[in-house]
Amino acid sequence: MSMSITQPIKDLLSSQFQSYNISEQVKLYDIFPLLKPSCIKEAITDVVEVCTGYGPESLDPSIRAKAAVKLSLCEFEAVGLSIIPQGCYSNSIEEMMDCMLEIEHSSHWWTTYSGNYQRLSDVCSTYREYYQEKAIIETFLNITDFMADFHNQFKSSVVSETQEFQSNMKDKFAGVYNQFTHFESLLSQMIQKHSGIINDSIVAIKNKLSTEFVDELQMLKNDRYILINQILESDTEIKKTIDSMLVELTEDMKNQISAKSEFLINHMNITRLNESTALHDIIEENLQERFKDIAIFLDKFMVEIQTETNKVLLEVNEKLPTLEQQYLGNFAQALSNIDKQVLSASLQWQYDYDVVFANLYAALDLLNSNLNSSVKKIEQIEHVIDTIIVDTSFLNDQLANLILIPSTILRAFSFIGVKRVIIAIIVLYFKSTLLCLVHYGQSFRIAALLMSATAGIFCSKLLMSYIYN
């Protein structure tokens, strides 16, 4: 392709025109006018060869004179001058000198020669530029040929490399597809081989979880029953302790009254011996009245203490069953909710695992998503277990509140006077005894008895100080 474009131009530049027809030459001459053959071109051939290599300053005078003569002859031929010296057509130096002598005799000839001789410098510069352009054109044509060849080679190389790359990629993709198919087959075989083991493992896990849940619930129920029994035993023990305190307080008060009565009787006998009978009668009458008042007051005081104590015990006995039933009902409801959540979670977990292992045979890309779903369900079960733990702690708090209910009820009473103070002390003892029994169990009974004795002595002292004052 490139040779069909640039080769005629190269041949034309080297003056090889014989292999081309007239129309091609005319076409090329129209594109490059400087390539047209002429008399002037032939006359300055030697000058141009020197100029293109070294410039106008390097022209030899003989070459310059010879070229000026030839240019003059071209002008003479162009104007149709028939008388031209014959020596001017020769290339020898001697005949050329004869030509110049003949030209010198004619002013017209000499003027033409002199003008051509002087203009050779300009002609040399002009043709030097032309030949430089010619060299540039040749260089351009060479580069064009090189680029055309390079383009063709590059195109063929790219096509070949692309085809080879496509072929290699097809082979590689085919190998990857075969490996993937083989891997899928192995995975299916492995799933079929181990499906029984996996199902057995799932069943074992579900059974283990169910057993653990049942055991945990049973432990919670046992703890609940033990705590309720402890509360009931503590209630009974408190009642017995209060009754014992009342009996001891009554006996102590009777003993104090008897001692005081004996002291008064002795004092009255001594007074009768030392004073007059009338005065003794008055004193005896006053003492008897005072003694009756004290006895009446003590009887009323004991009745009031017994009445207030019975009221407190009745209120406690009335409220405790209601609160126990309420909190036990809440506890049973919470346990029922826990059972339902555990059962629901177990059924849901079993269903999800069945779905996962059923979908494993569908496609390999669904395996990852199904496993993620299973992980989420396990997290839900863990959340349910956490909820069970929270509910258990809530039940413990409710039971602790149940223990503190008697103290809360009794604290609401506001008594005024010595009798109320004594009952308040009994209430405080009731509270401390109940709490200690809950926290320390049966080992606290001895300490409770010691506390009851201390409380009885303190109440007796308060009562005696009230009587004497």
Swiss-Prot record:
InterPro entries referenced in this protein's UniProt entry, alphabetically: Nuclear_fusion_Kar5
Localization of this protein: Endoplasmic reticulum membrane; Nucleus membrane
Keyword Coiled coil assigned: no
Lumenal side: 467-469
UniProt GO BP: karyogamy involved in conjugation with cellular fusion; nuclear membrane fusion involved in karyogamy
Segments traversing the membrane: 421-441, 446-466
Keyword Transmembrane: yes
Topology in the lipid bilayer: Multi-pass membrane protein
Pfam family, one: Tht1
An example Gene Ontology CC term for this record: endoplasmic reticulum membrane
Cytoplasmic face of the membrane: 442-445
Key words of the record: Endoplasmic reticulum, Glycoprotein, Karyogamy, Membrane, Nucleus, Signal, Transmembrane, Transmembrane helix
Glycan-modified residues: 21, 142, 199, 269, 274, 372
UniProt main location, coarse: endoplasmic reticulum
Family: Belongs to the KAR5 family.
Its biological purpose: Required for nuclear membrane fusion during karyogamy.
Name recorded for this polypeptide: Nuclear fusion protein KAR5
Gene name as annotated: KAR5
